[in-house]
Amino acid sequence: VIDRLNRYYVERKVQPYAPYAASQLAGAEMDEARSRLAAIMGVATEELSFGPSTTQNTYVLAQAFRQFMKPGEAIIVTNQDHEANTGPWRRLADEGIEIREWAINPQTGHLDTADLETLLDENVRLVCFPHCSNVVGELNPVTEITALAHAAGAFVCVDGVSYAPHGLPNVGELGPDIYLFSAYKTYGPHQGIMVIRRELGALLPNQAHYFNADVLYKRFTPAGPDHAQIAASAGMADYISALAHHHGGPETEGAEQGAFVHDLMRAHEVALLQPLLDMVKDRNDVRLLG
């Protein structure tokens, strides 16, 4: 990542996509980052966008939904969330949008899907929740929750900030309409990465310059992107590929290789943590959550 960032600043620090060598290379490196990360996450290249941070990306999305929704329609958020995926949505209450809170069980920190079902009705347009809570470490069943929301006619926005560092997920298989995470917490530069599925991205109002309205990955980037940091994000794919090759995983980049590294990281984390869990699980003065 650092080598790519340094090379961009030293050799490519020009406006990308112009008809001369340095500019063409600059654009190619930005495209490389987007296409390789999208392939790992099982989505189309155009469905992956970059922005300054996950919080900033969510604020842009909230503005799009503010224009898209009618007063009286509802958004479901949780009290288990990273602030980036709750604060921007809650502020839409000032615009007449109803905010419904899917609350955790205070004894376990768990989000019960039965409680979600009681909140869902024809007025709910969006359900927001974390893939993994940054407070209690709870892993939420994204596919199951997404299916419930979709059956009720709602879209789904998943905050993956606390999950992605443990292995990039296959968003295409999980099924949410939006998936957000932070590159700088996932072996990358200071960027927010946002997957928006094509169907929803086309429905939401354009938030970018009018001349970018027809390009999905530009529609939710209001300002000029950080060219160098986007290009450097390809280093995240380099790292995943290097891990796969070192541990005998798939040679070809893409979702299969990403899944191998995801499972590799998960197994290593479990092995490291299990002795601690074994030590504390029988203690009367410690209660495990998540």
Task: Please tell me what each predicted stretch does.
Residues V1-G290:
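Pyridoxal 5′-phosphate
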